[in-house]
Amino acid sequence: MLIIETPLLLRREVRRWRQEGKRIALVPTMGNLHDGHMTLVDEARARADIVIASVFVNPMQFERPDDLARYPRTLQEDCEKLNRRGADLVFAPSPDVIYPNGLESQTFVDVPGLSSMLEGASRPGHFRGVATIVSKLFNLVQPDLACFGEKDYQQLALIRQLARDMGYDIDIVGVPIVRAKDGLALSSRNGYLSAEERQLAPQLYQLMMALSAQLDNGDRQIDILLEQVAEKLREAGFTPDELFICDADTLQPLSAASTRAVILMAAWLGKARLIDNHQVDLTV
């Protein structure tokens, strides 16, 4: 497995594989890899001849400097995991390589609508950072496909819109959420949880599934349902951040025409911001 830090060397390897007729998959990550990331690599491996994983903690998508500073950097361990899983190349650039003129002078990519709604409304600039780094990676690697986790539901929708709008001939593959046995969605930020908080954390998933059951039963009093969930989260020790029930295809409010809903949840538990989502079929 190759470990490369510069765009020049990355392009050289990509060019060689292209000349050999290889099908290339990209798995973008911010490192601190867990089993959820490994399923992305597995999916990429099953669909392509070459798997390129990026490990880059992207400063442009952090709105809080303290959050950026404490995000775990575990490159050596990440590379060992990726090597064992069969990745062919790890692109691990420094911020100076990706943003040589600094963030303030960096050309950026913004996806209208999706960047500023829902999670984007409370995290200004976050999705601009996501769209910019993903665009850079797409331009550098020019993959046939790219794998992203469905845990970041709005991010996945944004990247699909980005690919359509910018004309990228790239298959965007969504990979299902990987969960611990108790239901907690795997996340790099789970490492911020204390032992006691880790015991409480699955309640986010449990409350989400209870909400799903209410939707299955035909309850459409969305505001009341969300307030009930928020109160239960607070009682359990969480600080609710974002709670939405949207049309799964448009991320707009549910309408009579909606056939699928998505529950989007984010809540703080101690120092960890936990996110999760679940889709609900409204036609049954």
Swiss-Prot record:
Q: What is its EC number?
A: 6.3.2.1
Provide the residue positions that the database annotates as binding ATP. Answer: 30-37, 149-152, 178, 186-189
According to its UniProt entry, one GO biological process term is: pantothenate biosynthetic process
Instruction: Write out the annotated subcellular location.
Output: Cytoplasm
May I have one GO cellular component term? Answer: cytosol
* Role noted for this protein: Catalyzes the condensation of pantoate with beta-alanine in an ATP-dependent reaction via a pantoyl-adenylate intermediate.
The family annotation for this protein states: Belongs to the pantothenate synthetase family.
What name has this protein been given in UniProt? Pantothenate synthetase
| Organism, as annotated | Pectobacterium atrosepticum (strain SCRI 1043 / ATCC BAA-672)
At the highest ranks, the source species' classification is: Bacteria, Pseudomonadati, Pseudomonadota, Gammaproteobacteria, Enterobacterales
* Gene, per the UniProt record: panC
